Regions:
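Extracellular/periplasmic periplasmic-binding protein-like sensory domains
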Residues: 236-314, 323-330, 380-381, 386-415
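Solvent-exposed, acidic/polar segments of extracytosolic/periplasmic ligand-binding ectodomains
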Residues: 26, 342-416
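Beta-alpha junction/loop-to-helix N-cap segments that form part of ligand/metal-binding clefts
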Residues: 25, 40-45, 55, 59-132, ...
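Venus flytrap/periplasmic-binding-protein-like
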Residues: 72, 120-128, 201-202, 242-264, ...
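Periplasmic-binding protein-like
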Residues: 86, 90-100, 118-122, 164-169, ...
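Sec/Tat signal peptide C-region and signal peptidase I cleavage site
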Residues: 16-22
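Extracytoplasmic "Venus flytrap"
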Residues: 29-50, 70-77, 99-102, 168-176, ...
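Extracellular/periplasmic Venus flytrap/periplasmic-binding protein
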Residues: 78-81, 127-130, 136-240, 279-287, ...
Length: 416
């Protein structure tokens, strides 16, 4: 009888020990666009997250981080399905999500239905996500699409001498935000945007778009990414297009500059702006690039991290540093973690990042030009660095609010 009792005690101790071990895990859900037009962006986002784990590790005090990855296709519905599955089925406690603009607005709104959890934006860049009715438990450590265009319009006008441009953009919130930033600055300097065309995500035939481009412009701005960007460049070259090109942030990062085929060569000399630049000589950036390169075989990565890899890296870093500050304490609806995340200042690879009162990143922006490294590889070369870019782009908040939210027609081409 005593022997049996001892066995039960031992079994009970084992079960309690197992439960304790299970409680030592902090579960984090991660989403990325691993299907659809932006698949290549999502894949590199995951590389950035993995690079952060390689650099920082997964230990938080005596707890271990456990990650669950879910796929989306850049649509709001797919993002909400993925996040709901991660919460309800996988029982994650923290979300690192999402990647794309419309997804971000949807996940921000969804976050309000789960105030007990913490949501850290992975990479999405629509302005509305944090600027309009922000969620108290949603934190974004990357700038939005308009912030990523700061410096481009002025440089195009003052240095390149461009006076008239046309734009082509994917018809959704992130690219509206990118064009918003470009138009505000270019038109504010005295330039004209004479033609704005919008195409659905996943467009394969750009013939009518190319045919409708005006001839009397100094440059064409491309707010495209992923497969859309490659398809346009191929067809533009075949049509004999010769105009100067300007690019949005995901038009000229390594997701496109490393694409197979000759289409990317049309981008040589393209002026653009982004939250990073491949050739930046800052030691922190160079260290990150090496960590990314060392983490994956050369044929399983880009020559340099894309903007998505950098965003996922920074978001993962913020999460781990925040958790370590509070020793993994998720009590009281994760109140200590949320307070820490709001105050963290990241010494990120692409410059210092801090959050404003809406938990939106204030960071560094880069005006770049696409160059050949002499061996056939294309990179973005720094031509100007702009620090401390906030979400109102330096405008008085009251003036900025009156401009309106980014859309197909907002802002107007005028000086505000």
């Amino acid at each position: 009888m005593l022997k049996g009792s001892l066995g039960l005690v031992a079994l009970g101790a084992m079960l309690l020990s197992s439960a304790a071990v299970a409680q030592e895990k902090i579960k984090v859900g991660v989403t990325a666009t691993l299907e659809g037009t932006y698949t290549v962006l999502g894949e590199d986002g995951i590389r950035g997250y993995q690079t952060a784990l390689n650099t920082l590790g997964k230990k938080v005090g005596d707890k271990e981080l456990e990650f669950v990855i879910a796929s989306t296709d850049a649509t709001p519905d797919s993002a909400i399905r993925a996040v709901r599955k991660l919460i309800e089925q996988d029982k994650v406690q923290i979300l690192l999500s999402p990647l794309s603009g419309d997804e971000g607005i949807a996940v921000k709104n969804f976050a309000k239905t789960h105030p007990e959890l913490t949501f850290i934006n992975a990479a999405s860049g629509a302005q509305e996500t944090t600027f309009v009715d922000p969620a108290p438990n949603f934190f974004r450590y990357n700038m939005d699409g308009a912030q990523w265009q700061v410096g481009l319009g002025k440089y195009a006008y003052d240095t390149k001498g461009y006076r008239k441009i046309a734009t082509i953009g994917e018809d959704y919130s992130f690219v509206y935000t990118q064009v918003f930033g470009l138009v505000l600055e270019f038109c504010g300097a005295g330039g004209q945007v004479t033609n704005r065309q919008w195409v659905p995500l996943g467009t394969k035939d750009f013939a009518s778009v190319i045919a409708a481009l005006p001839d009397d412009v100094d440059a064409i701005y491309l707010g495209l990414g992923g497969a859309d960007a490659v398809n346009f460049l191929n067809q533009y070259q075949q049509a004999g297009g010769k105009a100067h090109l300007m690019g949005g942030s995901i038009m000229v990062d390594q997701t496109i500059l490393s694409a197979k085929g000759n289409a990317k060569n049309a981008l040589l000399g393209t002026l653009a702006a982004s939250g990073q630049a491949d050739t930046w000589e800052d030691p922190g950036w160079q260290k990150f690039v090496k960590a990314y390169q060392d983490a994956f075989p050369a044929n399983k990565r880009f020559p340099s991290p894309s903007l998505l890899a950098t965003n996922y890296y920074n978001s993962t870093m913020a999460l781990i540093l925040g958790l370590r500050q509070v020793n993994g304490d998720l009590s009281n609806n994760q109140a200590k973690l949320k307070e820490a995340l709001a105050k963290i200042e990241l010494d990120a690879p692409n410059g210092k990042i801090k959050l404003d009162s809406n938990r939106q990143a204030i960071g560094t922006n880069f005006v770049t030009e696409v160059v050949d490294d002499g061996k056939g590889a294309l990179f973005s070369k720094v031509v100007k660095v702009i620090p401390n870019v906030n979400q109102t782009l330096g405008y008085d908040p009251a003036v900025f609010a009156k401009i309106g939210l980014p859309s197909r027609t907002v802002p107007e081409c005028k000086k505000y």
